[in-house]
Amino acid sequence: MIWIHDISAVLPVSREPERRDPTAIDTVVLHCTAMPGWNVWDTARYHTSPNHISDEGCPTIAYAYFVEADGLAYRCLTPDVRAWHVGLWNDRSIGVCLAYEGAGDGPPSHQLDVAAAVCARVARELGLDASRVLGHRELEGTGYVVERGEHVQRKACPGMMIDMNAFRAHVGRLLEQRLDEEVVDV
């Protein structure tokens, strides 16, 4: 059983976030913090202060879910909150972030297992299949651009050591076996 701890009511907020219709969400995006040692609280403080996304800071943490290196999972935002995690994709996507710097040998396998279960649960709740779980680097316009017919990578997020095809296959197996139903809110 995987427990998702809802901390949405206690995370810092810099201002009232925009709301959206959750039925418009068609993509689950996997991210990494890209900072060594950062946890959900460090990430939330960074996002709600002036940062690389906004000189004013984001209204909230940029991710709806967060998975620590030890596999502890958090719900940070409800699906109706429009988070600032992938530019033009913000209206139609929901973010899941790994506490992982995005380099080295890759995140711990247990952390990836928990992230896959969280992504499967979110996908089922939104009526999506595993093909709609993408890494930030896979999103055109934010993860990569096409210039003069060439694919130009802009982001490595959630880390190049994460095989997104294998991750999607894992999410798909969880959905087929309905194992995502063992992911519960606490």
Please place each PLM-identified region on the residue numbering.
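Basic/polar, cationic surfaces and motifs that engage anionic cell-wall
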Residues: 1-25, 78, 92, 98-186
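Short, conserved "active-site rim" segments that organize catalytic pockets and cofactor/ligand binding
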Residues: 2-77
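Peptidoglycan-targeting cell-wall enzymes and recognition modules
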Residues: 48, 54-58, 72-110
